[in-house]
Amino acid sequence: MAKGIDTRYRHKRLSRQWALGHFWTLVAWVCAWIMFFPVLWMVLTAFKQEGDAYTDPPRIVFHPSLTEFSQVFSGGVGPPFAHSLFVSLVSVVLVLALGIPAAYALSIRAVKRWRDVLFFFLATKMLPYVAAIVPIYIVALHLGLLDNDWALVILYTGFNLPLAVWMIRSFLLEIPREMLEAARIDGANLWVELTRVILPIAIPGVAATALICVIFTWNEFFFAYFLTATKGPTVPVFMVSFLQTEGQYWARLAAAAAVACLPVILAGWIAQKQLVRGLSLGAVK
């Protein structure tokens, strides 16, 4: 009898776990579709003509057209893409070049008062960026950096550096200390330890950090609009040109947004494995 009761209890527990697992799976799929639906609607609108984009109620079935994409590419999207690509790549390279040694000094070979340094990095993210636009604009004006890609490179490097230091530090803390001690016993200096031992292990975390910084840099609009809107607009600033006083070109704006999202989506797809490994590397002790 005891065996039968135990079997029924185990079966009931497994059934409850099965139902709970399917419930959370359903919740995850619903959340995923809620987040994905605006992107799907943007892509569908991009293949519509302007007349179809304005219909109420919206048309689900329509004749696909590449007219708006041709308008986007003929409207001078090349220079903004070049500006965004240059600013994103150079700023991320600078962030990694500064962030990796800083994270090393705050984790493996911790400097004095390292907690205060970490708090300083975190405190810089608490400042409202809007309050800094006027002094930043004045400094850029006096240095001749308005409508210059290097103004955004310097700015985005400063914005992304605290986040990069925090993330890379959490990844470096997961590296076994025994490996570092063995490398030091073998005579490895600081450079060899960093490049031959630490970076090969932490490369997924570094890749995840770099991709997050690229996404922020590529999508940033506020400072790019005020500092480079006249001669050197980035992709987000270029997209605003489709919002005009005589009317909103929704299909063309959706096509421009789809084109603007493509490089980031492609980079995320290529680095998907590294991104997942990197984001999970520092999550579990």
What are these regions (language model features)?
Residues 2-285:
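A hydrophobic, multi-pass inner-membrane permease signature
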